């Protein structure tokens, strides 16, 4: 049985099909453990119960052709048990409780519109019968697009077995002849309407917290100097764990996870790749913490793809090279005159470099490193010969590299991935030349020189403000990077602090 807190995942999915143990290829898998779902389900149940028990139940009075009445001192007892979640159809879900038990009591004073106007007093009880079946559920509509997510709970209904709800009237007078049941039934029906409306309201009030759990990963917190930004494609599928044993089994959102480039002009560029790797069930389900993020190579490949699409083609002019750089873009520079002797025919002229046509690397992950293979980048070296610039030669760079990654806890609610270039194996091929021979090994040495100054971005991830993190861990496995941590409700921590202060006698 899929239960209510799966809604936490469904808010970020445009195409959702709940299935058991059949994971599709994806770039990101976000898992919520059975223990976490159970805890959150209990919190939602408590919140809904408290909201219903705090409903205003004012005194009522009215009259009909047969009698006038006054109802006072309403009291309500209510319990919700066994929270559940179902998918009804695409983008329409159901959240509710398998069992609802309640008892509503109030006092009555009623007078018949007859000779002598006889009046009676007593109390009325409306409630569920022990052992009978009564349930309540709300329809929840989820809408996701590239800019916003909307979750709305509507149409809460209660379902009863016949005889599950009874109305009992207790008259305290010696003689009781005035019929009260019809009016009591009407009040009971109105109460059920208020009750279902209250459940709808309680769920909708929790929507911001539910949405916030996944909102931080919609956009990669990284912006290039040109203002371009990067989003994650969150279309995906909900998957139950392969062999569920708990009432609330571990659930994973298998998300496309491709990185989408948003240009400053508002256009979107989607990845040229598609996900192909499927982690094993064990890789996705064996975590013991509350929360798991599993990343496959497709996410990294599409990130390179998006960065290249944003940054390239790129032109580097001589004026952009710092004066302290050991290599200057000039035909008379020691490096260029050494690798391309033919440049001596064009002394002291600037060189412009046009970089283009990248080939995104293939990514492989094992327990010790993230490896990049066959990254290709072409560069034209253009001599700025007055009004007649021309391409002196073109170099094709092919690079294999290895990345090391560590996780840093920046605050109780934020962590970042710090990746560094552990090793790099560059190769260079001279594709064309108009100035004679060019020594490709010189460009290999140049790439080796810049290895130490290459800086990789360290994107940060923040959990919703309701939570703080503990036990944050990073693990590399076969073709996956897995981050796991526990989520602690910050409000519970504050309550614990208050309790500790209250018993401190020093």
Swiss-Prot record:
Keyword list (alphabetical) reads: Glycoprotein, Secreted, Signal
**What main location does UniProt list?**
secreted
Instruction: Determine the domain of life of the protein's source.
Output: Eukaryota
GO terms of molecular function: lipid binding
Write the protein's name.
Answer: UPF0522 protein A
What does UniProt give as the signal peptide span? 1-18
Native organism is Dictyostelium discoideum
Which cysteines are cross-linked by disulfides?
Answer: none
**Could you state one GO cellular component term attached to this entry?**
extracellular region
Per UniProt, subcellular location reads as: Secreted
Glycan-carrying positions: 145, 155, 330, 366, 418, 427
What family is this protein classified in? Belongs to the UPF0522 family.
């Amino acid at each position: 049985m899929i239960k209510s807190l799966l809604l936490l995942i469904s808010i970020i999915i445009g195409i959702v099909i709940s299935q058991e143990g059949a994971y599709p290829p994806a770039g990101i898998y976000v898992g919520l453990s059975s223990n976490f779902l159970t805890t959150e389900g209990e919190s939602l149940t408590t919140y809904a119960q408290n909201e219903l028990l705090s409903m205003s139940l004012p005194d009522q009075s009215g009259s009909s052709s047969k009698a006038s009445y006054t109802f006072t001192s309403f009291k309500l007892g209510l319990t919700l048990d066994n929270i559940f979640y179902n998918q009804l159809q695409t983008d329409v879900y159901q959240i509710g409780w398998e069992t609802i038990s309640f008892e509503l009591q109030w006092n009555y004073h009623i007078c018949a519109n007859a000779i002598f106007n006889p009046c009676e007093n007593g109390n009325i009880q409306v409630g569920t019968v022990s052992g009978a079946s009564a349930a309540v559920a709300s329809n929840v509509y989820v809408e996701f697009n590239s800019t916003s997510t909307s979750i709305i709970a509507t149409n809460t209904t209660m379902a009863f077995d016949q005889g599950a709800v009874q109305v009992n009237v207790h008259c305290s007078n010696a003689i009781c002849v005035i019929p009260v049941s019809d009016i009591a039934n009407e009040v009971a029906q109105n109460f059920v309407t208020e009750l279902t409306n209250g459940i709808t309201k309680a769920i909708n009030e929790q929507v911001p917290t539910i949405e916030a759990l996944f909102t931080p990963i919609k956009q990669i917190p990284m912006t290039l100097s040109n203002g371009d930004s990067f989003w994650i494609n969150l279309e995906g599928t909900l998957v139950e764990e392969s062999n569920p044993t708990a009432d609330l089994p571990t659930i994973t959102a298998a998300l496309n996870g491709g990185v989408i480039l948003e240009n400053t002009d508002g256009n979107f560029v989607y990845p040229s790749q598609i996900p192909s790797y499927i982690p094993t069930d064990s890789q996705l389900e064996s975590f013991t913490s509350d929360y798991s993020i599993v990343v496959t190579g497709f996410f990294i490949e599409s990130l390179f793809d998006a960065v290249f699409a944003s940054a390239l083609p790129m032109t580097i002019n001589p004026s952009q090279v710092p004066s302290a750089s050991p290599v200057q873009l000039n035909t008379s520079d020691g490096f260029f005159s050494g690798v391309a002797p033919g440049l001596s025919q064009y002394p002291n002229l600037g060189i412009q470099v046009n970089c283009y046509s990248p080939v995104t690397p293939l990514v492989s992950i094992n327990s010790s490193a993230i490896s990049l293979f066959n990254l290709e980048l072409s560069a034209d070296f253009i001599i700025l010969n007055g009004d007649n610039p021309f391409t002196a030669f073109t170099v094709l760079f092919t690079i294999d590299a290895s990345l090391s990654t560590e996780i840093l806890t920046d605050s109780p609610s934020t962590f970042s991935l710090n990746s560094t270039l552990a090793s790099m194996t560059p190769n260079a091929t001279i594709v064309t030349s108009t100035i004679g021979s060019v020594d490709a090994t010189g460009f290999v040495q140049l790439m080796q020189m810049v290895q130490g100054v290459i800086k990789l971005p360290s994107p940060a991830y923040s959990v919703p403000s309701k939570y703080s993190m503990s036990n944050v861990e990073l693990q590399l496995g076969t073709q996956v990077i897995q981050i796991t941590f526990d989520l602690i409700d910050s409000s519970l921590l504050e309550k614990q602090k208050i309790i500790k202060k209250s018993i401190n006698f020093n």
